[in-house]
Amino acid sequence: MKTLYSLRRFYPVETLFNGTLTLAGRDQETTGFAWWAGNARLINLSGKLLGAHVAHAGLIVFWAGAMNLFEVAHFVPEKPMYEQGLILLPHLATLGWGVGPGGEIVDTFPYFVSGVLHLISSAVLGFGGIYHALIGPETLEESFPFFGYVWKDRNKMTTILGIHLILLGVGAFLLVFKALYFGGIYDTWAPGGGDVRKITNLTLNPSTIFGYLLKSPFGGEGWIVSVDNLEDLIGGHVWLGSICIFGGIWHILTKPFAWARRAFVWSGEAYLSYSLAALSVFGFIACCFVWFNNTAYPSEFYGPTGPEASQAQAFTFLVRDQRLGASVGSAQGPTGLGKYLMRSPTGEIIFGGETMRFWDLRAPWLEPLRGPNGLDLSKLKKDIQPWQERRSAEYMTHAPLGSLNSVGGVATEINAVNYVSPRSWLATSHFVLGFFFFVGHLWHAGRARAAAAGFEKGIDRDFEPVLSMTPLN
């Protein structure tokens, strides 16, 4: 029977330039992988693979700490965060650290502490990574059976899955505890333009929480991305954290059922492909969340969403022209529709002009001016507050668009500030990374399935011309 990890299938064309650079158990002859194949050389060396993973975690945490301190060093409190190219400080501010009413940054010391803590953590992880990569045991199965594993051991693999799920659940509950007990988090919907508050009235009703999953992803429905209040958001984390923890305990205590043993491929490369698929889904969801959602990603820190900037422009000019004597309720625009206000097909009063396509935007600076049937004309005439005018004028000139001409009616040139919105950065990067992770999933899933089926696509390595050529060195 052909073994799953036959080295034959791996022999690459390349030969090593310098044989002295190799380490036993990590060279081409013993693993079937050349040095540039990275961690693939460590598939069957659990101790060394542990070192690679811990070192990788150290690099990630080092980036977080160093970038955090870099952003703190460059931060100017007088300017909004989204004008300064920051992507880490907005996350810390959203968690309620260093923020006052209206999203004003009142204290940067918590951000400094965060950066230093991450740097110290990265040093610990870096040391652990180097230790396990160079000094620690090559395999863990003999000395530390709890941490050892064989890729084909289905029971052990689901136990490891369970441990990971419990850790994810604990992470979800960390946010819950911060929101409930440790100072609260920033709520962009707090009266008067946003503030930090403790969440006291969690939404735990399953029909509300799981109702988000049943929503359409299109239009005003918006699937889970449509969450617009912190009670639902934190309640969702309670549910998700509980499901992850109980699911983790389940996977630790049980063995995979027969249907699961048959359905999945049980190899290291298969697990890699499953993980890449999960990360891809996370990336796509994060992309949509940061682009469309101004509750989880408050506009005070990340800048306005596209629809928000467009509606802000309509509002800003309505305010200006109303002061100059325009009758905003009846003025006609160039197309014969309302210039400032019009009715949606279902009868709500909405902003007129190109921004009509964004009529279902909800934003904290606009909602107080709505009545039971859309925008309230009497409120628009009498109740507009200075903070709403300031905020909409600011958002109008900071659309998350990279265009030289008008898009969705937003002035993106001449009157606008030349900047790239963190929403643009974060949405684009997560979409691109999500896409590449999906391609990686397809690639590794295909290889894993082919190996499990006992065949490989490709040329027969025994008859390659390079094997008869003189080695380069």
UniProtKB/Swiss-Prot annotation:
<feature type="binding site">
    <location>
        <position position="367"/>
    </location>
    <ligand>
        <name>[CaMn4O5] cluster</name>
    </ligand>
</feature>
<dbReference type="InterPro" id="IPR005869">
    <property type="entry name" value="PSII_PsbC"/>
</dbReference>
<keyword id="KW-0472">Membrane</keyword>
<dbReference type="InterPro" id="IPR036001">
    <property type="entry name" value="PS_II_antenna-like_sf"/>
</dbReference>
<keyword id="KW-1133">Transmembrane helix</keyword>
<feature type="transmembrane region" description="Helical">
    <location>
        <begin position="69"/>
        <end position="93"/>
    </location>
</feature>
<keyword id="KW-0148">Chlorophyll</keyword>
<keyword id="KW-0793">Thylakoid</keyword>
<dbReference type="InterPro" id="IPR044900">
    <property type="entry name" value="PSII_PsbC_sf"/>
</dbReference>
<keyword id="KW-0007">Acetylation</keyword>
<dbReference type="GO" id="GO:0009772">
    <property type="term" value="P:photosynthetic electron transport in photosystem II"/>
</dbReference>
<feature type="transmembrane region" description="Helical">
    <location>
        <begin position="178"/>
        <end position="200"/>
    </location>
</feature>
<feature type="propeptide">
    <location>
        <begin position="1"/>
        <end position="14"/>
    </location>
</feature>
<dbReference type="InterPro" id="IPR000932">
    <property type="entry name" value="PS_antenna-like"/>
</dbReference>
<keyword id="KW-0597">Phosphoprotein</keyword>
<feature type="modified residue" description="N-acetylthreonine">
    <location>
        <position position="15"/>
    </location>
</feature>
<comment type="subunit">
    <text>PSII is composed of 1 copy each of membrane proteins PsbA, PsbB, PsbC, PsbD, PsbE, PsbF, PsbH, PsbI, PsbJ, PsbK, PsbL, PsbM, PsbT, PsbX, PsbY, PsbZ, Psb30/Ycf12, at least 3 peripheral proteins of the oxygen-evolving complex and a large number of cofactors. It forms dimeric complexes.</text>
</comment>
<feature type="transmembrane region" description="Helical">
    <location>
        <begin position="447"/>
        <end position="471"/>
    </location>
</feature>
<dbReference type="Pfam" id="PF00421">
    <property type="entry name" value="PSII"/>
</dbReference>
<feature type="transmembrane region" description="Helical">
    <location>
        <begin position="134"/>
        <end position="155"/>
    </location>
</feature>
<comment type="function">
    <text>One of the components of the core complex of photosystem II (PSII). It binds chlorophyll and helps catalyze the primary light-induced photochemical processes of PSII. PSII is a light-driven water:plastoquinone oxidoreductase, using light energy to abstract electrons from H(2)O, generating O(2) and a proton gradient subsequently used for ATP formation.</text>
</comment>
<feature type="modified residue" description="Phosphothreonine">
    <location>
        <position position="15"/>
    </location>
</feature>
<keyword id="KW-0602">Photosynthesis</keyword>
<feature type="transmembrane region" description="Helical">
    <location>
        <begin position="291"/>
        <end position="312"/>
    </location>
</feature>
<dbReference type="GO" id="GO:0016168">
    <property type="term" value="F:chlorophyll binding"/>
</dbReference>
<keyword id="KW-0934">Plastid</keyword>
<keyword id="KW-0157">Chromophore</keyword>
<protein>
    <recommendedName>
        <fullName>Photosystem II CP43 reaction center protein</fullName>
    </recommendedName>
</protein>
<dbReference type="GO" id="GO:0009535">
    <property type="term" value="C:chloroplast thylakoid membrane"/>
</dbReference>
<keyword id="KW-0150">Chloroplast</keyword>
<keyword id="KW-0604">Photosystem II</keyword>
<dbReference type="GO" id="GO:0046872">
    <property type="term" value="F:metal ion binding"/>
</dbReference>
<feature type="transmembrane region" description="Helical">
    <location>
        <begin position="255"/>
        <end position="275"/>
    </location>
</feature>
<keyword id="KW-0464">Manganese</keyword>
<dbReference type="GO" id="GO:0009523">
    <property type="term" value="C:photosystem II"/>
</dbReference>
<keyword id="KW-0812">Transmembrane</keyword>
<dbReference type="GO" id="GO:0045156">
    <property type="term" value="F:electron transporter, transferring electrons within the cyclic electron transport pathway of photosynthesis activity"/>
</dbReference>
<keyword id="KW-0479">Metal-binding</keyword>
<comment type="similarity">
    <text>Belongs to the PsbB/PsbC family. PsbC subfamily.</text>
</comment>
